[in-house]
């Protein structure tokens, strides 16, 4: 899925760049690569005990985007964008005392990967340019659209419990099914363009909801993402 989508986005960049010369001066084609400097998800603990949720640790999250715009006015562009955002997962392990349901505390160790989701946002955009010099300009850009989200369909959770308090742990493994929903995608960014090269910083938000289930563990929760993204690109 990830490799296939990267090929699609790269192919789109090649096609749009090769056809950019055929467009009249009222159209612009942009290609961008970026990385999320900060990426925060809603906190979720996949557990049947009252254990702490995984830390919201920032991970390296690269992205690819292609955009085409029309010059609606001398300073305003409107258009469409398509992107791919890859978000890396992390590993969670927690050891703590928890209530066994009979008002007694037992030691529990839980270990599982924290599966993040990748997104394919498709969005409308409005861009306002502030001209300062002939080759240099700054701009403000707003995106709003829909994100198609995908994560790994299963998660393996290892649960170790010491009910007797003698460091003899009973180990259970749970195969948990996961599903994330698609949702709204929006962002606002500020950028600088020199000749055909641009740099941009943007805040983005992706809506999603996570559902997880196994024989003993079941639940659902909001799983939104907020990110601060830095991108560089080229106007063809």
From Swiss-Prot:
Signal peptide: 1-22
InterPro entries hit by this protein: OMP/PagP_b-brl
SUPFAM superfamilies: OMPA-like
Protein name in UniProt: Uncharacterized protein PM1543
Organism of origin: Pasteurella multocida (strain Pm70)
Keywords noted in UniProt: Signal
Highest taxon, organism lineage: Bacteria
């Amino acid at each position: 899925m990830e490799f296939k989508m990267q090929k699609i986005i790269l192919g789109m960049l090649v096609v749009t760049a090769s056809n950019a010369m055929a467009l009249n001066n009222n159209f612009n084609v942009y290609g961008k690569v970026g990385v999320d400097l900060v990426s925060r998800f809603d906190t979720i603990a996949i557990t049947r005990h009252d254990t702490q949720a995984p830390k919201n640790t920032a991970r390296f999250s690269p992205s690819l985007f292609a955009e085409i715009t029309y010059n609606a006015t001398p300073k305003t562009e409107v258009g469409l964008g398509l992107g791919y955002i890859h978000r890396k997962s992390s590993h969670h392990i927690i050891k703590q005392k928890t209530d066994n349901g009979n008002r007694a505390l037992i030691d529990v160790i839980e270990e599982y990967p924290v599966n993040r989701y990748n997104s394919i946002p498709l969005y409308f955009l409005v861009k306002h340019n502030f001209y300062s010099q002939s080759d240099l300009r700054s701009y403000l850009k707003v995106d709003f659209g829909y994100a198609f989200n995908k994560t790994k369909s299963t998660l393996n959770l290892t649960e170790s419990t010491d009910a007797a308090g003698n460091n003899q742990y009973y180990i259970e493994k749970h195969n948990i099914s996961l599903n994330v929903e698609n949702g709204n995608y929006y962002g606002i960014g500020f950028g600088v363009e020199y000749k055909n090269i641009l740099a941009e910083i943007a805040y983005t938000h992706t809506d999603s909801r996570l559902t997880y289930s196994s024989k003993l563990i079941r639940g659902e929760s909001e799983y939104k993402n907020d990110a601060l993204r830095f991108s560089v690109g080229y106007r063809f």
